[in-house]
Amino acid sequence: MRQIADFAGLMAAKTINHQITVKFCSTAHHLGGASYGPGGELVFNKFRLGADWFEQGITEEVVRLLIHEFGHQYSPDHLSAQYHEALCRIGAKLFASARSGEL
C-alpha cells in the first residue's frame, strides 16, 4: 500500500501540480474504489479494491484509477467537458513525466 500511496503522491505532483494526502478506508459504505476532491485528499477503499489490488504494485489499473480520480481536481462531473479535458491533460503530463524519467 505504501508503494501505491507514494506513487499517487508523485503522480499528483507531476500531473495536477498538487500535493495530496493519501488515506485508506475499508468500508462498504464508501462508494467506489477511491475518491478524490480538489481539497487534495485521495482515499483508497481497501474493501472495494481488495487486498490483491494493492499487492500487485503499480499496474495499469492503478494508473487508470489515479487518472480518473485526479480529474476531479478540475470537475466533479464525469460528463463535463472540464472533466474530459482534465483527463486528457493528466494523461499527456503522465506520458511526458514517464518519458523524461521523472516517474
Annotate each predicted stretch with a short phrase.
Residues 1-41, 95-103:
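Auxiliary, metal-adjacent structural segments of Zn-dependent hydrolase domains
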Residues 23-63, 73-76, 81-95:
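Active-site scaffold of zinc-dependent metalloenzymes
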Residues 66:
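Short acidic catalytic loops
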Residues 69:
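Walker B catalytic acidic pair
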